[in-house]
Amino acid sequence: MFATRFGTTEIVARAFERGLREAGLETICTRTGDVTPGSLNDWDLICLGGPTEVFTATKEVKEFLEAMGGIGMAGKFGFAFDTKLDSRMSGSAAKYIERALDDRGLHVIAARQSAIVTSRRDSGRIVGADLRKGEEERFEELGVRIGKATEEALDRMKRVAERQR
């Protein structure tokens, strides 16, 4: 799932989804506003990303995470990503998202990742953003790795459950 302001986070999310599919996972890639938190009960891996704004996640992402709060997420895996400027001062939406996923009981399958963007300005005002070269490909490869790691973790959980029967 993703929130986006200028479209770059959607590009990253869709590249990540291609990687997950290549690894053999069934996926749904959609905007946070098109998903009800209750529908997440059927998902094994919840990947959430958004743009970094004013050092953290956007209001849309924060509201989605807040709505997730009461839903049982135990046994699910999570991954956080964001798009941000290449600056130590830019902050990280992914850091906020990762902490929130962990607080809700998800097992974070891999450390958060950021796709770097450059801003387009008009008269000093940000009017768009572009992904740094190679970020789309990097996130597709990341999707493959996380997809395989998720499959392996789910298989381990299944074997443990079978032994406990």
Role assignments for model-derived ranges:
Residues F2-F6:
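Aromatic-flanked redox-active Cys/Sec active sites in thiol-based oxidoreductases
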Residues T8-I11, A15-T30, D42-R165:
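FMN-binding flavodoxin-like domain, especially the glycine-rich phosphate-binding loop
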Residues D34-S39:
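Short acidic active-site motifs
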